[in-house]
Design a protein with these regions (language model features):
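Terminal substrate-recognition subdomain of acyl/acetyltransferases
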Residues: 1-23, 138-178
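A short beta-loop-alpha structural element at the N-terminal edge
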Residues: 22-39
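Flexible, glycine- and charge-enriched loops at secondary-structure boundaries
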Residues: 30, 53-57, 119-123
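Conserved GNAT-fold acetyl-CoA-binding loop/helix
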Residues: 45-64
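A short helix-loop-beta-strand connector motif used in the catalytic cores of GNAT acetyltransferases and
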Residues: 65-78
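Conserved beta-strand in the GNAT
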Residues: 78, 84-93
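A conserved beta-turn-beta hairpin within the catalytic core of GNAT-like acetyltransferases
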Residues: 95-107, 168-170
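Acyl-donor binding region in acyl/amide transferases
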Residues: 102-163
Length: 178
């Protein structure tokens, strides 16, 4: 595809400038991805309703490394903007726990950094992560994608986006102190 470059007053091209600011998405697959995954998970954890629970970076590392080893069933996708990791999604595919012969994808964790969520790029990041999940799920033959939201962060905004991109509301999560 031919791109027409429009010079700016400084002589740089708009396409080159946008290439640095547009989000990119990739599957995480090596230990070099781990610091960004842990950093994003820790920030999201602190902000969420689960922030009172001590964060365990070793558990994040264990989950990510297990996903790296079994990429047919698990994956971590990282969203980057300007060379910095600004979001990620961890998902897996498998059978319904009391069913057989049908694969379902479960989004276990989807996070975007707080600063990116409040910008125009936040929507692009979220949509890119959802598209990545859909593509990955189709490649594995999943029939449905389950998206569970339990963070208690931006619930109305998350609900609106999920509905807009085709997710059907099928229930809710409830919590009570034991």
């Amino acid at each position: 595809m031919l791109k027409i470059l429009q010079p700016t007053q400084q002589g740089e091209s708009v396409a080159a400038k946008n290439a640095n600011t547009e989000p990119s998405f990739r599957l995480a697959s090596t230990d070099s991805d781990l610091p960004a995954i842990v950093r994003l998970a820790q920030k999201a954890h602190k902000e969420s309703r689960f922030g009172y629970i001590p964060f365990n970076a070793d558990k994040v590392l264990k989950i990510a490394r297990a996903a790296f080893k079994d990429q047919k069933r698990h994956a971590v996708m990282i969203a980057e903007r300007c060379g910095q990791a600004v979001g990620f999604v961890y998902r897996s595919v498998g059978e319904y726990h009391i069913g057989s012969d049908v694969l379902l994808t479960t989004i276990h964790n989807m996070n975007g950094s707080r600063t990116i969520r409040s910008s125009l790029s936040g929507g692009k990041i979220a949509l890119g992560l959802f598209r990545g999940v859909k593509t990955w799920s189709k490649a594995r033959g999943a029939k449905e994608i389950l998206f569970h939201v339990t963070s208690d962060v931006n619930l109305a905004q998350t609900h609106k986006l999920a509905k807009r991109i085709g997710y059907k509301f099928v229930g809710g999560s409830y919590v009570k102190t034991a």
